């Protein structure tokens, strides 16, 4: 907004001097045209008129130079200052953009490091959990093996006891069968007497 107002003021400084210079040149042109007919009619150069026109031209040029010198110098000076200001702003924005880029790059690098750290921690935690599961499975397998060994030992012991009992029963039955076959009546009487005697002695 301020730049637009300043630009209008700068243009106004040029318009009025140019308008005045245009009026002077127009007046000089009219004077030149009015004097031109006499020159063509007479066929010789009118030095007084030539000098007057030259003087008017010099005065006009001097006035224009004086009027336009400062506005033109001011215009170019202001334009130079404006360009320098724009360049400074552009350089500042470029530095800000580079700084933002560097900050974003640093944040991205930090994010990558943090992400890798989290991934490594998760992998380590997973490895720990996996090791715990393996250890628990091994303990459970050992416990089951021990239980199986105990059960097998108990079954073996029971089988042995049963076998011993069966052998004892078979031995007794075989002995009874042998005794029945080989024992005579007098032997039976003797065994009965011995048994009764032991019973009496025990009492």
Curated annotation (Swiss-Prot):
Keywords: ATP synthesis, Cell inner membrane, Cell membrane, CF(0), Hydrogen ion transport, Ion transport, Membrane, Transmembrane, Transmembrane helix, Transport. It is a single-pass membrane protein. The chain crosses the membrane at residues 14-34. It comes from the Bacteria. Its main location: membrane. It is found in: Cell inner membrane. Coiled coil: none annotated. GO terms for cellular component: plasma membrane; proton-transporting ATP synthase complex. GO terms for molecular function: proton-transporting ATP synthase activity, rotational mechanism; proton-transporting ATPase activity, rotational mechanism. F-type ATPases have 2 components, F(1) - the catalytic core - and F(0) - the membrane proton channel. F(1) has five subunits: alpha(3), beta(3), gamma(1), delta(1), epsilon(1). F(0) has three main subunits: a(1), b(2) and c(10-14). The alpha and beta chains form an alternating ring which encloses part of the gamma chain. F(1) is attached to F(0) by a central stalk formed by the gamma and epsilon chains, while a peripheral stalk is formed by the delta and b chains. PANTHER family: ATP SYNTHASE SUBUNIT B, ATP SYNTHASE SUBUNIT B', CHLOROPLASTIC. F(1)F(0) ATP synthase produces ATP from ADP in the presence of a proton or sodium gradient. F-type ATPases consist of two structural domains, F(1) containing the extramembraneous catalytic core and F(0) containing the membrane proton channel, linked together by a central stalk and a peripheral stalk. During catalysis, ATP synthesis in the catalytic domain of F(1) is coupled via a rotary mechanism of the central stalk subunits to proton translocation. Component of the F(0) channel, it forms part of the peripheral stalk, linking F(1) to F(0). Belongs to the ATPase B chain family. This is ATP synthase subunit b. It comes from Syntrophobacter fumaroxidans (strain DSM 10017 / MPOB). The lineage of its organism: Bacteria, Pseudomonadati, Thermodesulfobacteriota, Syntrophobacteria, Syntrophobacterales.
């Amino acid at each position: 907004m301020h730049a637009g107002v300043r630009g209008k003021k700068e243009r106004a400084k040029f318009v009025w001097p140019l308008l005045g210079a245009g009026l002077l040149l127009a007046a000089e042109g009219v004077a030149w045209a009015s004097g031109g007919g006499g020159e063509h009619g007479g066929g010789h150069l009118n030095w007084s008129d030539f000098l007057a026109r030259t003087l008017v031209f010099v005065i006009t040029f001097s006035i224009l130079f004086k009027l336009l010198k400062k506005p033109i110098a001011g215009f170019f000076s202001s334009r130079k200052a404006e360009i320098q200001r724009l360049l400074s702003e552009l350089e500042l924005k470029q530095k800000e953009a580079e700084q933002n880029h560097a900050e974003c790059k640093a944040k991205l690098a930090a994010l990558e490091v943090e992400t890798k750290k989290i991934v490594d921690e998760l992998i380590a935690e997973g490895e720990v959990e996996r090791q715990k599961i393996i250890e628990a499975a091994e303990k459970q397998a050992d416990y089951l093996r021990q239980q199986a060994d105990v059960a097998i030992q108990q079954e073996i012991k029971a089988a042995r006891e049963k076998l011993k009992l069966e052998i004892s029963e078979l031995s007794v039955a075989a002995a009874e069968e042998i005794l029945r076959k080989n024992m005579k009546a007098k032997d039976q009487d003797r065994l009965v007497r011995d048994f009764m005697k032991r019973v009496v002695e025990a009492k």
